[in-house]
């Protein structure tokens, strides 16, 4: 994303989110940057975003069992994490928290649904008795399926950037602590990656060099066809989702927790007319990622939400569409900062919707 993107103008806090960098972890592939500190967004040593209670207290996840008898969990991707929230106390998890029962933010930026499930499995020893598990998800699986050349493996799903996550600079984290050479190589990879992301001229040079150096190198170990259609990849994702729901149901029952699935908000998945700022931000993204239009439209939403609801019902999991909380809003209200990230007001609306459905 260019620094000239309108999000930086309308939401200056976005710079702090933009500067965050994922950290490699086995099986989940990455977590949010651990121990990240800034004016708008902060994470703990586990990469979990800070949750702030109504009284102003910070929730210490490793010490949860010492301070609370029970907690709620909300899990998903960057919308749950709270990208573009103006503060840690303006996220959905903080809005859902009470001073007695915190809601822990297990939002992992860029995570697909399998990664969400795995992250919960790794984090669950940290929690006291779990009262509610809220899954707020949906867009990342659709976005991955819409990307040209993305891979969705039968029975395994897929992740964003899986080619680079098997090469540089992320896998180098495995050996970074063992010797100085690995550490220096890791620093070099990260420096190249950041400049490639931020500097168009540098990016063009790297592409030209790689095209000459490796253009004729044969491909190997292709496990699936990269030309698979959006519809076929989406079909694979939905089949995988059904398997995940069975696991989620068993995990929730083992904790004695109430489990609900909430389809997350997305541009054009509701009846809200876009505000001037929303149209400007989404329009800028659409120029760079035209594949967004494949899923960010009313017809796709109607079909996809129906399919997810059926899988939820088959697993015995209540399904709710949070886009209903936005349907009645007009173009005078800013809710989206891009295709699926929310303003503070949007986070509050979604939190109120989740709370209402969970307490019904």
Predicted regions span which residues?
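Interaction-surface signature
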Residues: 5-18, 114-225, 264-268
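Short catalytic/ligand-binding loop motif for oxyanion handling, primarily in non-cytosolic enzymes
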Residues: 81-84, 112-114, 141-146, 267-273, ...
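Serine-esterase "nucleophile elbow" of acetyl-processing enzymes
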Residues: 51-109, 113-134, 342
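Histidine-centered active-site loop/cap adjacent to the catalytic His
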Residues: 38, 241, 309-321, 335-360
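Solvent-exposed, polar/charged alpha-helical surfaces in well-ordered, non-transmembrane soluble domains
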Residues: 94, 118-121, 243-246, 250, ...
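Conserved, well-ordered alpha-helix/loop/beta-strand core segments that scaffold catalytic motifs
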Residues: 133-137, 204-327
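N-terminal secretory targeting modules
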Residues: 1-71, 86, 126-129, 146
């Amino acid at each position: 994303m260019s620094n000239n993107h309108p999000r930086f103008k309308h939401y200056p806090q976005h710079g702090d989110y933009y500067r965050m960098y994922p950290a490699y972890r086995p099986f989940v592939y990455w977590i949010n940057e651990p121990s990240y500190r800034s004016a708008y967004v902060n994470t703990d040593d586990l990469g979990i975003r800070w949750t702030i209670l109504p009284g102003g207290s910070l929730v210490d996840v490793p010490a949860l069992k010492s301070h609370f008898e029970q907690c709620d969990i909300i899990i998903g991707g960057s919308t749950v994490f709270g990208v573009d929230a103006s503060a840690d106390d303006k996220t959905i998890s903080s809005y859902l928290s009470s001073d007695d029962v915190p809601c822990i933010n297990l939002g992992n930026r860029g995570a697909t649904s399998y990664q969400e499930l795995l992250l919960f499995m790794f984090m669950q020893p940290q929690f006291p008795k779990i009262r509610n598990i809220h899954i707020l998800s949906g867009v990342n699986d659709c976005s991955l399926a819409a990307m040209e050349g993305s891979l969705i493996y039968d029975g395994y799903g897929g992740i964003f950037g899986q080619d680079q996550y098997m090469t540089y600079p992320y896998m180098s984290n495995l050996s970074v602590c063992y010797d100085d050479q690995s550490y220096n190589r890791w620093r070099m990879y990260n420096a190249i990656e950041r400049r490639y992301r931020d500097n168009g001229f540098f990016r063009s040079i790297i592409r030209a060099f790689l095209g000459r150096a490796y253009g004729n190198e044969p491909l190997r170990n292709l496990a699936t066809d990269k030309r698979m259609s959006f519809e076929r990849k989406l079909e694979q994702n939905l089949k995988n989702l059904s398997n995940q729901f069975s696991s989620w149901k068993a995990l929730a029952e083992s904790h004695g927790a109430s489990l609900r699935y909430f389809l997350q908000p997305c541009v054009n998945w509701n009846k809200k007319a876009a505000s001037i700022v929303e149209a400007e931000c989404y329009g800028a993204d659409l120029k760079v990622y035209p594949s967004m239009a494949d899923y960010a439209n009313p017809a796709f939403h109607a079909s996809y939400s129906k399919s997810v609801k059926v899988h939820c019902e088959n697993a015995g999991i209540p399904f709710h569409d949070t886009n209903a909380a936005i349907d009645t809003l007009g173009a005078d209200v800013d809710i989206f900062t891009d295709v699926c990230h929310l303003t503070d007001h949007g986070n509050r609306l979604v939190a109120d919707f989740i709370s209402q459905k969970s307490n019904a």
